[in-house]
């Protein structure tokens, strides 16, 4: 059975794989704002990053706490890379909307992943003084 961290990794991994597959399976994916990345490889190659990292996050969902850290690192990689590319496009003036997309990646992806990585698997309630004695 998955704990809290495992459930987060399973959801994050599934979402990342779906996002990457959306770019891979679309006949003509739109890479606007990602020119920093597409200089080095096509958008479908960068979409594979989402699929591979999503699979790693999903697979890490069933590992024990402490061993699941690589799943959280894998989950961070695609939104960090793509968010940086959108920020670059915005700062360069090529894609003004990139700043908003960067903010979205920073909060709803990276922020949530960092929060989920810090969630303890089990929380023990604090005992009242009378219960401790």
Language-model segments: residues:
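Hydrophobic alpha-helical membrane segments
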Residues: 49, 69-88
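Membrane-water interface at the C-terminal end of transmembrane alpha helices
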Residues: 106-130
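Juxtamembrane helix-break-helix junctions at the cytosolic face
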Residues: 55-69
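A loop-to-helix transmembrane entry motif
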Residues: 33-50
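Membrane-helix boundary connector in multi-pass membrane proteins
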Residues: 65, 80-102
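Alpha-helical transmembrane segments of multi-pass membrane proteins
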Residues: 16-27
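Cytosolic juxtamembrane helix and N-cap/initiation of the first transmembrane helix
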Residues: 1-16
């Amino acid at each position: 059975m998955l704990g809290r961290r495992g459930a987060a990794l399973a959801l994050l991994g599934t979402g990342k794989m779906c996002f990457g597959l959306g770019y891979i399976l679309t006949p003509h994916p739109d890479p606007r704002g990602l020119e920093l990345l597409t200089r080095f490889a096509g958008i479908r190659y960068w979409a594979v990053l989402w699929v591979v990292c999503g699979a790693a996050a999903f697979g890490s969902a069933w590992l024990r706490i402490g061993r699941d850290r690589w799943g959280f690192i894998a989950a961070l990689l695609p939104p960090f890379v793509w968010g940086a590319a959108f920020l670059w496009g915005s700062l360069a003036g090529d894609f003004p909307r990139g700043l908003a997309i960067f903010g979205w990646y920073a909060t709803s992806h990276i922020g949530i992943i960092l929060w989920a990585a810090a969630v303890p698997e089990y929380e023990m309630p604090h005992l009242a003084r009378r219960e401790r004695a």
